[in-house]
Amino acid sequence: MVGALFRTGQVLLVHRSPDRAAYPDVWDLPGGHREPGESELDALARELHEELKVRIVAGSTSHLCRLDAGRGPDRVRLSAWLVSDWRHEPTNAAPEEHDEIRWFPVAELPPLAHGLLGIALMDAIGTHLA
């Protein structure tokens, strides 16, 4: 589960620490895994609070896409959500996972940990805003 916090044409990305075992030293959307019994939105809300200390405002999410990334035992199914409203200013609350957070204009996103996610994100945001 990953979330694209979106405001005024920009998306918040997290830079994965160079010490991370999986996908080190790359930009990514914040998020993580679902716990047993959690819905996608519950997992998204929990992960964004744990990593950024934000609280998603009810009704402010739109599903962007699902895609498979990686191979073999590293394969994961990503579900990406657009979040357009939240409480509290995002802060790096997980410095052991991310060494930086930064807003990027949608048209200038850097390469993401999962390459297809960046393409899907730009397409989905364009469709969402149309």
Regions found by a protein language model. Give the residues of each.
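Conserved Nudix-box catalytic region and its N-terminal flanking loop in Nudix hydrolases
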Residues: 10-50
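Short connector loops at helix/strand junctions that flank enzyme active sites
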Residues: 6, 24, 58, 73-78
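Conserved N-terminal beta-strand and adjoining loop/helix that marks the start
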Residues: 1-12
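NUDIX/MutT-family hydrolases
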Residues: 82, 91-125
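Short secondary-structure boundary/capping segments
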Residues: 3-4, 19, 72, 92-95
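Active-site-adjacent beta-strand/loop module that shapes the phosphate/pyrophosphate-binding cleft
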Residues: 9, 65-90, 102, 124
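A short coil-to-beta-strand element that immediately follows conserved catalytic motifs
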Residues: 55-65
